[in-house]
Amino acid sequence: MVTVGNYCEAEGPAGPAWTQNGLSPCFFYTLVPSTLMTLGVLALVLVLPCRRREVPAGTEELSWAAGPRVAPYALQLSLAILQMALPLASLAGRVGTARGVRLPGYLLLASVLESLASACGLWLLVVERSQARQSLAMGVWMKFRHSLGLLLLWTVTFAAENLVLVSWNSPQWWWSRADLGQQVQFGLWVLRYMTSGGLFILGLWAPGLRPQSYTLHVNEEDQDGGRNQGRSTDPRSTWRDLGRKLRLLSGYLWPRGSPSLQLTVLLCMGLMGLDRALNVLVPIFYRDIVNLLTSKAPWSSLAWTVTTYVFLKFLQGGGTGSTGFVSNLRTFLWIRVQQFTSRGVELRLFSHLHELSLRWHLGRRTGEVLRIVDRGTSSVTGLLSYLVFNIIPTLADIIIGIIYFSMFFNAWFGLIVFLCMSLYLILTIMVTEWRAKFRRDMNTQENATRARAVDSLLNFETVKYYNAEGYELERYREAILKFQGLEWKSTASLVLLNQTQNMVIGFGLLAGSLLCAYFVSERRLQVGDFVLFGTYITQLYMPLNWFGTYYRMIQTNFIDMENMFDLLKEETEVKDVPGAGPLRFHKGRVEFENVHFSYADGRETLQDVSFTVMPGQTVALVGPSGAGKSTILRLLFRFYDISSGCIRIDGQDISQVTQISLRSHIGVVPQDTVLFNDTIANNIRYGRVTAGDSEIQAAAQAAGIHDAILSFPEGYETQVGERGLKLSGGEKQRVAIARTILKAPDIILLDEATSALDTSNERAIQASLAKVCTNRTTIVVAHRLSTVVNADQILVIKDGCIIERGRHEALLSRGGVYAEMWQLQQQGQETVPEDS
């Protein structure tokens, strides 16, 4: 009968890591399985947030193809199953060849942990295959490589099998194959080596994730149809494509074009490294003080050591939650770098938004876009701060602690720190992911509760009309109770997280302290070493206590950053062609030739529109709402590109010249004038930002608003308010006309510039517009036909087509649509609504 003995059996409770010309089997089979188990669980944790894609209705199951990559995936799956079974087979081999010798406890632990770690890898392999198949079923290529966690697990497993080779000359291992037991273990090791090596190589290839491995059948009768190449809208893990996100983020870490800030970044990195050194030196000097006090050292040595310790403590930080001189200096220096980064991101986003088309802006809520900009900017600076100055330093402290305790204490101390901190991080991530849904539900219910209160107060009179105060109070009470129930879950889960963290640190401190006390009692360590270990572990616990918060913030920032980068990836619809030159303006002849155009819905807004505006002429566009009149102006200004046909100015295709040169020759007076929340002078100056005050006043006089401006208490420095709401409709239109006069364009576009004004204001504005349009090519969109009776040509547009054209008298004599519209307006029947 086989029995289990002590953990390390002959090596004692804590033998050395290197003994008899090789690694200690006890140490090796404690470290490696623990590491693999940690990596396996961590890989699973990072996959937990990934949700399964919903396969669209009508999409059938994917079938295996007879392609060359199906067999490699089957081999990969077989190797993963074999790898999971081999540790148990090794344990069975040990039991079968023990011959009455007690098995050390570490073998049992190693077999269980290695099998569980391999099971994690197998499960991840199947899940990633399933995700790839679902992605393919939706016509979206999700990825063509395994996750970082799975690759790391296979890499470390293969590296561990190679690490065994350093013990080739050690009699503790099976290399001599002296008996049946060693021969069995050697054979199993060869099998493990081949298995782990095969998984490592196949993992880099990832045959099970290649699209050629599948055949997609959708609705059988449409098998030859193209795949949907649209972007998937499924919720994705925050940590997916982490490497790509970090590469994008790293571009903002280095302030390009600013040598002084680059030097500041290097200095901050140096200070961060100094902080890591201080975290080691402070416990060391604390240990030295205890040892000096214990050994009754001379006062001079003690005073020098205490002084040095206090100085290092000043540099590091005085107590819990406080920051020291080095950290404060680094924070101070980083302010300029953070401002540089924030400024660069905001300017890049702002420039990109102005490059996007009018179609894009009309389809988006401005508030939503600005939230993406604000959150995206803060996410970049926040991520840099959290990652560079919180997460990375904490992980560095853990690694330094593992190395230090392994080298200067005993390898078992390094293993204890590694297991304790790994378990701490894994449990923190798992519990944080688990409790995220409680926080999300609580926020949703909080919004609903506030909405309930706001809705009730906004309808105050209605509540009074129906004596519904009690009903509203009860509804609000129910909403509060529901919110508080979710709040309790969120708070209780936070308490559970904190208690879990406390237990892990407590067990780690207990294990390390007992081992340290054992070595002190054996005279292998000093009393100060016991103090050093406890101080360093407690010191690590302080930043780790905030790890859950950092994790949540990084999650949120990654999401905001993704939205920002999605915004930056929006394609510019209207672009200058390569090699486009400036518009060479001569006289101002405008031509539309067989122009077709449609918006996103596919319905043609303009159909075969052709007309010519001779230099200095005025052409009016009239017709019912939605006919396409304003669209013609937008196409000429090149807010959109036409579907077919050609638009020319002085014989030059406007799609072949630069947009900025085209728009510099065109002035627009829109129907709904929107002014900036600035002074009247600056709103007029917007027509030409280099204009002086005298030019602004001259433009205002030409627009007939100079006297009205002077009547204001602050004159030209009067603030117009948001969107110009402090001015009347007529005053806003005159400011817009003055702005256009100041621009002095060669072509004028008037988009129902007076339709929203009363009769007296309209006549005054028409007089101002007549001055602006003199000797300039002008296109007018008109609602009131009386304003265009003197136009050189009137185009009647209906359903995107020009159905009549001519001068006012000729169109009336023809008795067509224009004559009917004129008759109705003369009778005072406003049957033609304003154009949209």
Swiss-Prot record:
Gene3D superfamilies: ABC transporter type 1, transmembrane domain, P-loop containing nucleotide triphosphate hydrolases. N-glycosylated. InterPro entries: AAA+_ATPase, ABC1_TM_dom, ABC1_TM_sf, ABC_transporter-like_ATP-bd, ABC_transporter-like_CS, ABCB6_N, P-loop_NTPase, Type_1_exporter. Residues 265-556 form the ABC transmembrane type-1 domain. Residues 1-205 are annotated as: Required for the lysosomal targeting. GO terms for molecular function: ABC-type heme transporter activity; ABC-type transporter activity; ATP binding; ATP hydrolysis activity; efflux transmembrane transporter activity; heme binding; tetrapyrrole binding. Pfam families: ABC_membrane, ABC_tran, MTABC_N. It is found in: Cell membrane; Mitochondrion outer membrane; Endoplasmic reticulum membrane; Golgi apparatus membrane. Residues 48-72, 128-147, 207-264, 327-375, 419-499, 551-836 are cytoplasmic. CDD domains: ABC_6TM_ABCB6, ABCC_ATM1_transporter. SMART domains: AAA. Contains two independently folding units, the N-terminal transmembrane domain (residues 1-205) and the ABC-core domain (206-842) are respectively responsible for the lysosomal targeting and the ATPase activity. Belongs to the ABC transporter superfamily. ABCB family. Heavy Metal importer (TC 3.A.1.210) subfamily. ATP-dependent transporter that catalyzes the transport of a broad-spectrum of porphyrins from the cytoplasm to the extracellular space through the plasma membrane or into the vesicle lumen. May also function as an ATP-dependent importer of porphyrins from the cytoplasm into the mitochondria, in turn may participate in the de novo heme biosynthesis regulation and in the coordination of heme and iron homeostasis during phenylhydrazine stress. May play a key role in the early steps of melanogenesis producing PMEL amyloid fibrils. This is ATP-binding cassette sub-family B member 6. It comes from Rattus norvegicus.
